[in-house]
Amino acid sequence: MSRGSRRTAVAAIALLAMGAAACGGGSSTKSSSSSSGSNSALVFGSSADPKTLDAAYVNDGESFRPIRQIFEGLVTTKQGGTDVVPALAESWQPSADGITWTFNLRKGVKFQDDTAFNAAAVCFNFDRWYNFKGIQQSSSISYYWNTVFGGFAKNDDPKLGVSLYKSCQAKDDNTAVFALTSPSSTFLSGLTLPAFSIASPDALKKYNADEIGGSASSPSFSSQFGTAHPIGTGPFKFSSWNRNDKLVLERNDAYWGDKAKLARVIFKPIADGNGRRQALQSGEIQGYDLVAPGDIGQLKSAGYQILERPAFNVGYIGFNQAKAPMDNQNFRQAIAYALNRDALVKAKYPEGAEVATQFQPPTLFGSSTSVPTYNYDPAKAKTLLANSGVTNPTVEFWYPTGVSRPYMPDPAANFQAFKADLEAVGIKVTPKSAPWSPDYLSAVESGNAQMYLLGWTGDFGDPDNFIGTFFRQKLPEWGFDNTKIRDDLEKARVETDLGKRTTEYKAINDEIMTFLPGVPYVHTKPALAFAKNVKGFVPSPVQEELFSLVTLG
């Protein structure tokens, strides 16, 4: 997820039966609209409205959630996992040198405006993104294009690099051939992102998709395509959108694959987490995402379903080495040994959370079993602190307010626990807090924070999306420039042999944790709560969750 919203893991969702009272938790009551028949409807309470329904312009979960129902990409991820599987492309083949990729497309697929999906449509979409101009190129708007492809046909920002994307050719209606500027091991997995969903070229042109106002920091998404006519190939199509009230999708009866079981899905914004829980309990909604750890037991006892996503995140303490004494290796190690991460995870996180030993989840290839683990050892922390030569050790420790994340449901509680650990070994802590966005993120990302709580939820199943995101370039929040780590990460990124990449990433994880730019402390399994009658929802580590599979019993 993006620098601003990459840590904004998909926010809470809920489902509400339209036009009548919805089910309670363990009860079997249901409204006429919450049956499993062809007229069933699901109202899904979200934490916020989408920014826009043009997938190319967004990087937040609340926008991507309905986008995933309307649009599809060439490839997607396996339900419940991160393996790449076919979507609009049935198969693909890279050339021996990794420069050319040929995608064989599904036949007989149509967009929701009844125009044909074909190779020309695929190339139109990629060429549209490649030719973005002005504020369209900013990372706040085209974050995922910048992440996967790194540049445009003509870069308006000199900081942008050469694009990985070179061209797309429609060899025939069912064959799209991509040319890259260099081999890339992350190209295919990057295409699973909803940002690369294929839209109807006719609709993009007719409804002025490239119409965008405002500034890079405060864009205005006013095009009719993104607000009223988003046209894709997915199992649901756009029906209506009343901002701050509800977004309604209806079943696409002309869908090329298995038809959706539900007639409609309705996304209803409920900003407050307690409000979403109360709405579930009152029967106003039927489920929501990112259940607070303290609510799980209560909801289970009341008969609600609790579903967990596989762990695909990391919570960590970051050190800014540009602010002494964080540049002192012994001092950083002293902090690591002082932190009782096991106690925090057991006390403050739901069942299934585990202590992190590195900056990527253990389920991802390249995780190492030989990293330094810095197990809780206050005596060793005191020795390292003495060896550091730092007199009167003091740190400014930042934590965010007004936010809850899967890896950090209660930032203040984490801060207090870690503060006590540090002071117990003789490190004085100066608390620094700020609202999450924009103040806290700005302070961290600009390099103003000395030590801070942060985290990351992965976008796709590749180590480069974790440790590459953090350390493949020099970033102010870390305040160091370790060229060995950067070079090793770049080498692993372009390596196309999976066995070699796995070995390389294991070594890099060892290297990172020896260098110790921060202390990863938790991987969590975000929980969703649903009423008993909601069936078929498959939690995904990357939030690739399809409502077309859901039924109401």
Task: Give residue spans per PLM region.
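Surface-exposed binding/hinge segments that line
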Residues: S138-I212
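Detector for C-terminal structural segments
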Residues: N242, A338-G366, D410-K419, D439-G553
